Design a protein with these regions (language model features):
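Glycine-rich oxoanion-binding loops at beta->alpha junctions
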Residues: 48-106, 146-153, 157, 359
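Short glycine-rich or small-residue beta-strand-to-loop segments that form or flank ligand, phosphate
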Residues: 3-11, 69-71, 104-108, 173-176
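Short, acidic/small-residue loops that bind anionic groups at enzyme active sites
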Residues: 30-31, 37, 121-145, 199-206
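Accessory alpha-helical/coil subdomains and C-terminal extensions
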Residues: 97, 108-110, 116-120, 148-167, ...
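N-terminal phosphate-binding or glycine-rich loops at protein starts, especially the Walker A/P-loop
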Residues: 1-50
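Short glycine/serine/threonine-rich phosphate/pyrophosphate-binding segments
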Residues: 13-23, 46-47, 91-92, 103-119, ...
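C-terminal non-catalytic interaction/assembly regions of soluble proteins
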Residues: 256-359
């Protein structure tokens, strides 16, 4: 007999349903007596006791369905120890609801903030398994997160579509890709779509170098240029500012520009006189069905999580390392970001074929 809880937290993405399906199938095909409880809308459901028992029917036909059948919400880790508006101790409430159902394990699907809370619950004595979800691919301890390649596909398609109109009108186009702190999504979508300039948070850009790349293409007979810009891209000047000054600068910029891409566009226009167009795919990058790669990855991660549960092994994240599913102790990975390093192989390969990173 196993009694488990499932919870999806943070921003939604593709393959959340597919991953939960992998967990449940991995258990139901190996034990006869299984109870599964789904906590609704992320940690809110665990805090306030909003849950329901799930059956095999709930997991039928969801391999290809985007979003999450459980709903999700954001519960910042830094506020987890702070009582709610009614004075409720959220951590104690989560523990009580876990024990109320007499769970053997709680399987938590989410990104970095979700993972930190998962580790907190582990420290509080609960049996926890975390599965790494994010389109940013920025979770330390795994080569790949589910949702990433689906988002790469969507962002790449968006840039591909811009290519045709950019070439027809001989214009400079900026496509803004999701990623506030890390640039994996922009990097991969930029390379996959043949972007000429890629700007990511980890490599502060020099706008003059960006303009130089555009002018070089014009001299070589290319009348259009495509820039893939992460929403967290930052200039070299801004990157050197102290945190408080940078925050003020960003607040001031936000009153002038809808996002960083519009700022980059204005800076290019001021230096070249060119007309720049900006396209923002936005939340479409998180939506839709998971791509085949993510369906396979999520099934493998879910199956590996089921194996840990069957063996009564808890306190781990299940990651993918060198093509193999691995268990990673939560205390080793919680709170760590996997950043793009300036000397990453992907960066070196991209530069070798002429892609500019504005540095």
């Amino acid at each position: 007999m196993k009694r488990i809880g499932l919870l999806t937290s943070g921003g939604d993405c593709q393959a959340l349903n597919a991953t939960m399906r992998g967990v449940v199938k991995g258990l139901s095909h190996n034990i006869d007596d299984l109870e599964v409880y789904g906590f609704m809308n992320g940690y809110k459901g665990l805090i306030y006791g909003d849950y329901r028992m799930l059956t095999a029917k709930d997991f039928s036909g969801i391999l290809t369905r985007g979003g999450t059948i459980l709903g999700t919400s954001r519960q910042p880790f830094k506020l987890m120890r702070t009582p709610d508006a009614n004075g409720l101790d959220k951590v104690e409430a989560m523990k009580q609801n876990y024990h109320k159902l007499n769970l053997d394990c709680l399987v938590i699907l989410g990104g970095n903030g979700t993972q930190k809370t998962a580790n907190l619950l582990r420290e509080e004595g609960l049996n926890i398994i975390h599965l790494p979800k994010t389109i940013d691919n920025d979770i330390w301890g795994t080569d790949m997160t589910f949702g990433f390649y689906s988002a790469v596909n969507i962002a790449t398609d968006a840039i591909d579509c811009i290519h045709t109109t950019a070439s027809s009108h001989n214009r400079v186009f900026i496509v803004e890709v999701m990623g506030h702190k890390v640039g994996w999504l922009t990097l991969y979508a930029g390379i996959a779509s043949g972007a000429d300039v890629i700007l990511i948070p980890e490599i502060p850009y020099d706008i003059d170098k960006v303009v130089e790349a555009i002018e070089r293409r014009k001299r070589n007979g290319s009348g259009f240029t495509i820039l893939a810009v992460a929403e967290g891209a930052i200039s070299k000047e801004d990157a050197q500012l102290p945190k408080k000054e940078l925050k003020k600068k960003m607040e001031a910029d936000s009153k002038i520009y809808p996002s960083v891409s519009y700022k980059v566009a204005k800076e290019i226009e001021d230096r070249t006189g060119m007309e720049i167009r900006v396209t923002v795919p936005g939340h479409t990058q998180r939506g839709g069905s998971p791509c085949p790669y993510d369906r396979v990855l999520s099934t493998r991660l879910g199956s590996a999580a089921a194996k840990l549960i069957l063996n009564d092994e808890y306190g781990y994240m299940v990651g993918l390392i060198n093509g193999k599913t691995k268990k990673v102790p939560l205390e080793e990975c919680a709170g760590k970001l996997k950043m793009v390093t300036p000397d990453a192989q992907e960066i070196r390969d991209a530069k070798r074929i002429g892609i500019s990173f504005g540095d």
